[in-house]
Amino acid sequence: MELILLRHGKAENTNPDGDFSRALVEKGRAQARGAARLLKSAGLLPEIVLTSPLVRARQTADEFCQTANLPGAVIQGWLASGMDPKTAMSEHAAFRDFKRVAIVGHEPDFSTLAEWILGVTGGGVEIKKGAIACLRITPPARFGNLLYLVPPKLAGETEPGD
C-alpha cells in the first residue's frame, strides 16, 4: 500500500476561535490545488483521502479533492494535531484494501510518522506546508520505503499561467 502524506497548506497564523479554526490563506489553497494537479498528471492520485478535522486540513483536502475530481475527503479524528505513529498505523490499517491512500494532516506528526515508518531517528525528515510525501508500506510490517518527497515549490504552489 502507498501512503501519501499531504501536509495542509499555508494557513493564517492565528484565529480568534483558536488553533482548530485556523483557515488556509490563498497560498495554502494554491498549494493544495498544485499537489492535486501534480499527482493527477503523474497518475498517482489516491483512491481515498482522509483528513484531520482541523479547518486548515479540511480546506486542504477539499481543494485537493475538487481539483483532482475525487470524492470528498473522510474526516478522521485520529489525524488531528498530536497524532501518535502507532495509533496512526493502527487506524490506517482499516483502509488496507486501497492501493493508495492520502492523509491530510499536520507537523510534527507527519515527520514523526515518516521517520517511524522509515526507521529513521534524529529528525531526518521534514514535511513543509503543502509538501507531499509517499511511503510504500507492506502490512502488517511497520517499516516501509520512501517513494517520493515533493516540496511545495515543486508540487506547484502557484496556479498555471502565474
Predicted regions and their residues:
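Short Pro/Gly-enriched beta-strand edge/turn motifs at strand-loop
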Residues: 74, 114-119
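Generic beta-sheet signal
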Residues: 3, 97-105
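A short acidic, often aromatic-flanked loop/helix-cap motif at beta-alpha or helix-coil junctions
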Residues: 80-84, 154-157
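Extended, charge-rich low-complexity interaction segments
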Residues: 107-116, 158-162
